[in-house]
A protein has these predicted regions:
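Flexible loop/hinge segments that line or gate small-molecule binding clefts
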Residues: 109-145, 156, 164, 260-268, ...
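Short beta-strand elements in bilobed, periplasmic/extracellular small-molecule ligand-binding domains
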Residues: 61-75, 164-167, 189-206
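Extracytoplasmic "Venus flytrap"
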Residues: 28-58, 62, 69-83, 100-104, ...
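Short, low-complexity disordered leader/linker segments with a strong preference
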Residues: 1-35, 91, 112-119, 343-347
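Short, solvent-exposed amphipathic alpha-helices that sit
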Residues: 47-62, 146-150, 175-195, 210, ...
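Hinge/cleft segment of the Venus flytrap/periplasmic-binding protein
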Residues: 26-33, 172, 176, 288-347
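Hydrophobic alpha-helical
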Residues: 87-90, 96-116, 184, 200, ...
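Hydrophobic alpha-helical segments within soluble ligand-binding/sensing domains
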Residues: 29-31, 82, 138-164, 210-212, ...
Length: 347
């Protein structure tokens, strides 16, 4: 009788634990023909072109006979353009859409419509805030970490005396930018950042001229400004150029997220002493592997699912801790640049 009870208890325990057991690592097999769309926030941005190169590398590796469609809206029509591209892709019946979302939750109806047709929807760089209509988000780095890195760079540049700084962001609808800034504001509550004062936030819409003008407007508005923090590769270059053109690099520094190849001159002349970024080539590569694996059925969009993504190694899908809902694949890592390593990284 005791053995029977023990056996029953063991069976019940297995029944409880089974759904939470680790999933077997998925094998993403090459050779399937899958129509896929890579959708950046908009065209004409260097980091998105790098992501495209990474996706093409993965496509070649996976021997997908279907040509990758790299489609994007114009900067002036980014939100409506992204929605239109997703809607058209769904009508075409593609296998997977990879979106760097610049539309907030406005893209949800189009994403849900695509998802309802069996199309796999992977976001990269910037997720759908509510996660509705999305299978998984491929995150370049942890968003909370991004905020802390920004706060740390501000502290390092401004030193013990601290001072006033402002943020030059991309667009108000960019989920990634908003999350990074919110994380930075949370980090700034730590007493060690007590002497850093966030004066304000402006948006350059990832347009060079607009960002340049917004940087100068910050200088005019905040007379005690010591630093412009730009978590956008377009914004940081534009702000650095504006400070250089106005001979303000000795008074106002620039930092944020930038490409070494675009920032090397500004780091060497002292306008932008520190900045950070990750590999967009790797981000495009991993996003393609993820979307292809989902579309071919090799990968399940479930927490605990792991898979090998070619040269980048093994990744695991988890619940996204930065959103109330949604799944995430965390890529990483951050790279920080200064006068000691920027030239080598720029080559």
């Amino acid at each position: 009788m005791k053995k029977l009870l023990l056996a029953s208890a063991a069976a019940a325990l297995i029944g409880v634990l089974a759904p939470h057991a680790a999933m077997a690592q998925a094998t993403v097999k090459p050779g399937s023909a899958v129509d896929m769309v890579l959708l950046p926030k908009f065209l004409g941005i260097a980091v998105f072109d790098q992501a495209h190169n990474g996706a093409e590398e993965a496509a070649k590796e996976l021997k997908n006979s279907k040509k990758l469609q790299y489609l994007g809206p114009t900067p002036e029509n980014s939100v409506a353009g992204q929605i239109e591209i997703v809607t058209n892709a769904a009508t075409q019946g593609v296998g997977a859409i990879m979106i760097s979302n610049n539309s907030g939750d406005q893209i949800v109806p189009a994403a849900k419509a695509a998802h309802a047709k069996g199309i796999k929807v992977v976001t990269w760089d910037s997720p759908i805030p509510s996660a509705e209509g999305e299978d998984v988000f491929v995150a370049q780095v942890d968003f909370a970490e991004t905020g802390k890195v920004m706060a740390d760079m501000a502290l390092s540049i401004l030193g013990a005396e601290g001072g006033s700084f402002a943020v030059l962001s991309a667009s108000p609808d960019a989920a990634n930018q908003n999350a990074w800034i919110a994380a930075m504001q949370t980090a700034l509550k730590d007493p060690k950042y007590a002497k850093l004062k966030l004066a304000g936030i402006v948006y350059g819409n990832d347009q060079s001229e607009t960002s340049y003008n917004q940087a100068l407007a910050l200088v005019d508005k905040y007379k005690d400004l010591k630093l412009i923090m730009a978590p956008t590769t377009v914004g940081i270059v534009s702000a650095a150029k504006a400070m250089q053109d106005e001979n303000l690099c000795g008074k106002i520094k620039v930092s944020g997220l930038g490409l070494p190849s675009e920032m090397v001159a500004y780091t060497k002349n002292g306008c932008a002493p520190q900045f950070a970024l990750w590999s967009f080539v790797d981000l495009g590569y991993l996003s393609y592997y993820t979307a292809y694996g989902l579309a071919t059925g090799a990968i399940k969009a479930e927490a605990g699912q792991s898979f090998k993504a070619g040269r980048m190694g093994t990744y695991t899908i988890t619940k996204d801790p930065t959103r109330k809902e949604g799944l995430r694949i965390l890529m990483g890592p951050f790279s920080k640049y200064d006068i000691n390593n920027v030239e080598a990284a720029a080559k």
